[in-house]
From Swiss-Prot:
Signal peptide: none
Annotated compartments: Plastid, Chloroplast
Gene Ontology terms, MF aspect: rRNA binding; structural constituent of ribosome
Principal cellular location given in the protein's record: plastid
GO biological process, one term: translation
Primary role: Binds 16S rRNA, required for the assembly of 30S particles.
Protein name according to UniProt: Small ribosomal subunit protein uS14c
Highest rank taxon of the organism: Eukaryota
Complex and partners: Part of the 30S ribosomal subunit.
Keyword 4Fe-4S: no
Cross-referenced InterPro entries: Ribosomal_uS14, Ribosomal_uS14_bac/plastid, Ribosomal_uS14_CS
Keyword list, A-Z: Chloroplast, Plastid, Ribonucleoprotein, Ribosomal protein, RNA-binding, rRNA-binding
GO annotations of cellular component type: chloroplast; small ribosomal subunit
C-alpha cells in the first residue's frame, strides 16, 4: 500500500490540473496562432509561470483503494491485485470469470 501522503499528493495534483486546464489550453492555442516570435516568447513565459503540478503529464494513475501505481486498470481505477480480489468477491458488476 502506498503512503497516505503520496495518495494525497496525487489528489492535490489532480485538483491543480483541473483548476488550470482551460488557462493552459488557451495559452497553448495562442502560442500556435501567434505570428511574431516576440508574442510566442511572451506566451511561453506565461505558460511557464503556471504551477508545475498543473500539467497533466505529472499525474500518475493510482489505485483508488491501495494507492498502488503499477498494474493499474483504467476501466476500474484499481490495481490488478484489488481488481482480482473484488472480482472474486463479486463486487464488480459485469465481471465474470473467463472460461473457454
Amino acid at each position: 500500500m502506498a503512503k497516505k501522503n503520496m495518495i494525497q499528493r496525487e489528489l492535490k495534483r489532480q485538483k491543480c490540473v483541473l483548476k488550470y486546464e482551460t488557462r493552459r489550453q488557451l495559452l497553448k492555442k495562442q502560442i500556435t496562432l501567434a505570428s511574431t516570435l516576440r508574442e510566442k516568447l511572451m506566451l511561453h513565459r506565461q505558460l511557464q509561470k503556471l504551477p508545475r503540478n498543473s500539467s497533466a503529464v505529472r499525474l500518475r494513475n493510482r489505485c483508488m483503494i491501495t494507492g498502488r501505481s503499477r498494474g493499474y486498470h483504467r476501466d476500474f481505477g484499481l490495481s490488478r491485485n484489488v481488481l482480482r480480489e473484488m472480482a472474486h468477491q463479486g463486487l464488480l458488476p459485469g465481471v465474470v470469470k473467463s472460461s473457454w
